[in-house]
Amino acid sequence: MHIDVIGHGPALVLLHGWALHGGVFAPLVERLAPHYQLHLVDLPGHGFSHDDTTPLALPHVVAAIAAATPAAVWVGWSLGGLFALHAAATQPQVRALAMIAATPRFVRGSDWPDAVEREVFVQFGQDLARDYRGTLDRFLALDTLGSAHARSELRSLRETLTARGEPAASALQDGLGLLERTDLRRALATLARPSLWIAGQRDRLVPAAGMHAAAARAPHAQALTIDGGGHAPFLGHADQVAEALHRFVAALP
């Protein structure tokens, strides 16, 4: 699995969202690399890990990343948050957890109202088989929908998407399956690590209320909402997200 290592200082592991790669975090790298050693992962089937054979399943990916990185704070965005949360619940070397626009369950249920309908991910999977590039572009648009900086964020995501080659279609389907079926809520009550939950006020994929609900279930958790932020708040609101991460990490024991 490809992992870029940039900067010096306490280690952070950064995990990207569906269809993208570690390069998407460039605005955070610019702000955090002077203070931290950043481990930027390309998940299997994505970016420079296009041909990596690690199954895109939580235990396999987390074990591989943990074996290749030092003790660190794990930061997960969107789909990457599922891997980060699983790591925080199972890997002793995870110092703390930061979730950006991510929750333990992405689909709505009778006891989990602040999420999207399961059919959203099912439809993307069906569309992907018929129109690969068009479906990816529609998903990127959903990432930025509602953001105060939607236009510039969408341009950035489009430029980033294929900068390291196109993601593997099989990995995209596996990722949609994780978003559709994963439910890690039971891990929250016993989460021993401190956690930070950063929501976008205007996020249409992961409502801020859902992130605050998740944080309320975890001990040692804090949550904040980025005003005007969409599903990728670290793009248009990079200063606020970087500052929140910096304050969180600086306060760790």
Swiss-Prot record:
Is-annotated flag, keyword Amino-acid biosynthesis? no
Enzyme class at the top of the EC tree: hydrolase
Q: Which SUPFAM superfamilies does the entry link to?
A: alpha/beta-Hydrolases
Q: Which residues form the active site?
A: 78, 203, 231
Q: Which Pfam families is this protein grouped with? A: Abhydrolase_1 (PF00561)
Its catalytic activity?
6-carboxyhexanoyl-[ACP] methyl ester + H2O = 6-carboxyhexanoyl-[ACP] + methanol + H(+)
In terms of Gene3D superfamilies, this protein maps to: alpha/beta hydrolase (3.40.50.1820)
Coarsely, its chief localization is cytoplasm
Q: Name one GO molecular function term.
A: pimelyl-[acyl-carrier protein] methyl ester esterase activity
Q: Does the keyword Cytoplasm apply?
A: yes
Among InterPro entries, the record links this protein to: AB_hydrolase_1, AB_hydrolase_fold, AB_hydrolase_sf, BioH
Q: What S-S linkages are listed for this chain?
A: none
Q: Which UniProt keywords apply?
A: Biotin biosynthesis, Cytoplasm, Hydrolase, Serine esterase
Residues the entry annotates as binding substrate: 18, 78-79, 139-143, 231
The annotated pathway is: Cofactor biosynthesis; biotin biosynthesis
**Alphabetical GO biological process terms:** biotin biosynthetic process
Give the stretches traversing the membrane: none
Cellular component, GO annotation:
cytoplasm; membrane
Which compartments is it annotated to reside in? Cytoplasm
Query: What family, per the record?
Result: Belongs to the AB hydrolase superfamily. Carboxylesterase BioH family.
Q: Which HAMAP family match?
A: Carboxylester
Query: Subunit composition?
Result: Monomer.
This chain's protein is named Pimeloyl-[acyl-carrier protein] methyl ester esterase
- Please tell me the species this chain comes from: Xanthomonas campestris pv. campestris (strain B100)
**Encoding gene per record:** bioH
